[in-house]
C-alpha cells in the first residue's frame, strides 16, 4: 500500500498514465493475487510469447542452492551433457570479456536478430549497461573457435539469483554447440557467486512441438531447469483514456515492426 500510494503521488506530479510492475511471483500465488487486486491493480496474464512483455512470463529456472557442479551436470538431459562435452572436444573455448568485447558481441547479436527476426538494441545500450553493472553485477562471456568469436552471452547477478539476459550466436560453426558450453559456464559463475537460482529466462507459454519457439523450450529444458510461470504484468491506470490510446499505438508499432523484420529476413 505504501508503494501504490507513493506511486500515485508521483504519477500526479509527473502526469504519468500508468504504473506497471512485473514481479518475481509465481502465477499460483493466490494470496498475492488477492492483495494486489484489492490495491487496485489489474493483472495481465494472457501473454504467451515471451517477447510480448518487458519481462517474460514463462521461464526455465534451475535450483542450484547447495549443489555441486557434478550434481548439476548429472541432472542435465543426456543430449545436453553430450553437447557440452562436444563443444569442448571440438575446440570451443570460453573467455570472460570486457567492454571492448561488446563490439564482437553486438556484431554477432545483429546476425542473430536477422536470423531469428527480432530487433536489436544499439551497441551504446550494452556499453552503458556494462558501465553501470560490470564487473560485480554483469559479465560478458565469448565463445571462440580457432581464435574467432562465434557466440556470446551476458549474464547479470543480483542477490541470490543469476540471470541469462542476452545471447548471440553466429551463423557459422553452430554445429560446434558453443551455446551449450556458454550456458554451463554461466551456471558455474552462478555457483561461484553462491546464487540459489540460475534463470535461463524466457520461453513461449505454448508448449507444442509444432510451435516455432519449441526448439528454445527444449534447449533450456535440457539443463534440468523447471518450467516456471509468473503472475504476469500488474498495471494501475491513472489515466485510462490516455493509456488506452497508448496501447493502441503500441499494437500498431509492434505490427509494423514485425512486418519490417519479416521483410528484412527475406
Q: PLM features: residue spans?
A:
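Conserved GNAT acetyl-CoA-binding A-motif
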Residues: 11-25, 190-202
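A conserved beta-strand-loop-helix scaffold within acyl/acetyltransferase catalytic domains
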Residues: 23-28, 38-175, 189
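Acidic, aromatic-enriched beta-alpha/helix-loop junctions
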Residues: 1-12
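Charged, often glycine-rich, active-site loop that binds/positions anionic groups
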Residues: 32-36
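Anion (oxyanion) recognition and catalysis
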Residues: 12, 37, 88, 191-192, ...
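Active-site/acyl-donor-binding loops of N-acyltransferases
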Residues: 38-67, 197-266
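Short catalytic/ligand-binding loop motif for oxyanion handling, primarily in non-cytosolic enzymes
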Residues: 27-31, 206-208
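Aromatic (often tryptophan-rich) hydrophobic motifs at membrane interfaces
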Residues: 4-6, 127-239, 244
Amino acid at each position: 500500500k505504501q508503494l501504490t500510494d507513493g506511486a500515485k503521488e508521483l504519477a500526479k506530479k509527473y502526469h504519468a498514465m500508468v504504473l506497471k510492475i512485473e514481479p518475481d511471483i509465481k502465477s499460483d500465488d493466490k494470496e498475492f493475487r488477492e492483495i494486489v487486486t484489492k490495491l487496485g491493480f489489474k493483472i495481465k496474464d494472457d501473454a504467451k510469447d515471451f517477447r510480448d512483455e518487458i519481462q517474460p512470463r514463462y521461464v526455465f529456472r534451475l535450483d542450484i542452492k547447495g549443489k555441486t557442479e557434478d550434481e548439476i551436470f548429472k541432472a542435465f538431459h543426456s543430449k545436453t551433457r553430450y553437447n557440452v562435452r562436444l563443444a569442448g572436444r571440438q575446440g570451443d573455448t570460453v573467455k570472460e570479456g570486457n567492454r571492448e568485447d561488446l563490439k564482437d558481441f553486438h556484431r554477432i547479436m545483429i546476425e542473430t536478430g536477422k536470423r531469428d527476426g527480432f530487433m536489436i538494441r544499439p551497441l551504446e545500450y550494452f556499453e552503458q549497461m556494462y558501465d553501470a553493472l560490470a564487473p560485480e553485477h554483469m559479465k560478458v562471456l565469448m565463445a571462440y573457435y580457432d581464435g574467432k568469436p562465434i557466440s556470446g552471452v551476458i549474464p547479470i547477478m543480483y542477490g541470490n539469483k543469476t540471470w541469462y539476459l542476452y545471447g548471440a550466436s553466429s551463423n557459422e560453426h553452430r554445429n560446434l554447440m558453443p551455446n551449450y558450453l556458454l550456458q554451463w559456464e554461466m551456471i558455474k559463475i552462478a555457483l561461484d557467486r553462491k546464487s540459489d537460482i540460475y534463470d535461463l529466462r524466457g520461453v513461449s507459454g505454448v508448449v507444442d512441438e509444432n510451435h516455432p519457439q519449441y526448439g528454445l523450450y527444449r534447449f533450456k529444458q535440457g539443463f534440468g531447469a523447471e518450467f516456471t510461470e509468473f503472475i504476469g504484468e500488474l498495471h494501475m491506470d491513472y489515466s485510462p483514456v490516455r493509456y488506452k490510446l497508448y496501447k493502441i499505438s503500441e499494437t500498431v508499432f509492434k505490427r509494423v515492426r514485425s512486418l519490417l523484420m519479416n521483410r528484412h529476413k527475406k
